């Protein structure tokens, strides 16, 4: 990459999965900071994980693998979900901004994942889970109220990361960088050091 050096990785959610793979394959970064990395998906109830694997595996080779995965929504989450029950942020202003971006620029809208995407993601997360952690300084942040990614996978990965540090943010939901100001500040301060 022809960018000023040194390089640092900051990655959120699925970006955390992609970023971890890139680091494992030699991305030349000095350190990494992960925000609620998707190293596993939180299924509720947990038995849904079995169904997700089975259905996405069966649908993957078919032409319908590009269809929205069963149980996923075609309307973007921040448009159909109200603030009180959302799983992304406790900051009403930040949550409103997320939805407003999509209303102003509809081309930014994403629906739920396709069955093919879900299957590829599940496979990649399992492959990464089986690998040792990189020899690289890292920070990882997750909230106690996380409902999108699998917290156990994060805890397991960071316990195996010799020069890694996990910060668990009390009450925080999935969007650490769009959470209440004191949580955002904690993330940006530690990441910037």
Segments and roles (model prediction):
Residues 2-13:
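Alpha/beta-hydrolase fold nucleophile elbow
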Residues 4, 29-30, 164:
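Core-facing hydrophobic residues within beta-strands of well-ordered domains
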Residues 11-16, 143:
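Conserved alpha/beta-hydrolase "nucleophile elbow" surrounding the catalytic nucleophile
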Residues 14, 18-109:
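Alpha/beta-hydrolase-fold enzymes
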Residues 109-131:
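Active-site nucleophile elbow and catalytic-triad environment of alpha/beta-hydrolase enzymes
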Residues 134, 140-142:
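Short beta-strand/loop motif that positions the catalytic acidic residue
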């Amino acid at each position: 990459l022809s960018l000023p050096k040194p390089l640092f990785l900051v990655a959120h959610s699925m970006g955390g999965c992609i970023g971890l793979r890139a680091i494992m394959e030699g991305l030349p970064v000095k350190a990494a900071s992960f925000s609620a990395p998707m190293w596993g998906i939180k299924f509720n109830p947990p038995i849904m994980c079995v169904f997700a694997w089975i259905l996405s595996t069966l649908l993957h080779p078919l032409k319908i693998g590009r269809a929205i995965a069963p149980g996923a929504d075609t309307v973007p989450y921040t448009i159909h979900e109200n603030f009180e029950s959302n799983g992304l942020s406790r900051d009403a202003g930040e949550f409103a901004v997320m939805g407003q971006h999509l209303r102003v620029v509809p081309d930014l809208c994403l629906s739920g994942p396709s069955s093919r995407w879900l299957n590829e993601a599940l496979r990649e997360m399992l492959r990464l889970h089986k690998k040792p952690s990189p020899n690289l300084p890292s920070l990882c942040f997750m909230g106690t109220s996380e409902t999108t990614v699998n917290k156990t996978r994060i805890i397991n990965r960071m316990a195996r990361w010799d020069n890694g540090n996990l910060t668990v943010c009390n009450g925080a939901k999935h969007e650490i960088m769009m959470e209440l100001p004191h949580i955002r500040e904690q993330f940006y301060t530690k990441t910037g050091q």
